[in-house]
Amino acid sequence: MMSKKKIYLFCDAGMSTSIMVNKMQAVANEHGMPLEISAYPVARAAEVVETEKTICILLGPQVRFLLQKTKDKFEPLGIPVGGIDPEIYGMMDGEKALKEALKLIKSQKK
């Protein structure tokens, strides 16, 4: 069995982000993508990424101000980092959010 690749969403507290995770995971499952999508508070980012290899980090709009700092920390490790577009987040559009993550992953591999 193929191991699942991990995508992490980081936010302030995690309530609305867990809804987005569920929507993104449903789209991934629907398309047979071997992905595991999880949400954590941004304060735990270093700890979570250190213990679990991730292929992509997305920040929720509430913590988007930390985007550059997060990129500076994790992109040198080969982990692409992006922010979820506030409009996509507001609509809780799991498909568009997942597409954004996949674009980030592809751009990192070039």
Feature-to-residue mapping (PLM):
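Conserved active-site segments centered on acidic
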Residues: 5-44
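Ser/Thr/Gly-rich flexible loops in soluble cytosolic domains mediating phosphotransfer, phosphorylation
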Residues: 6, 78-110
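Short, surface-exposed alpha-helical segments at coil->helix boundaries
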Residues: 18-22, 64-71
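Short, well-ordered alpha-helices that flank and scaffold nucleotide-derived cofactor binding pockets
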Residues: 22-30, 72, 99, 103
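Short acidic active-site motifs
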Residues: 44-48, 66
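Short acidic/histidine-rich motifs immediately flanking catalytic phosphotransfer sites
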Residues: 51-56
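Short secondary-structure boundary segments
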Residues: 60-62
